Amino acid sequence: MNGIYAPHFEVGDHILIVWNEGQYGKSKNYLVVGNKHFNYSLADLLTGELITPPQETLSDLQEIIQNDIDNGRIRFIQSF
């Protein structure tokens, strides 16, 4: 899969996030969206620091991910 596209989520979707290759190689993280809240923020996933999750809404998650796409921090997102 090539290219970058805006994600479209429904509550309960399982989202696979694949990050750009960095100094320490490529990392893959899984993010489960459910109950209109998500388990980990993108910053937590990116740094590997899984802390108490923020109570953000599904639309907040979409905005955060879109910002990371726009800033080039996410190469692509695949829903499955």
Regions found by a protein language model. Give the residues of each.
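Intrinsically disordered, low-complexity, charged/polar segments
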Residues: 45-80
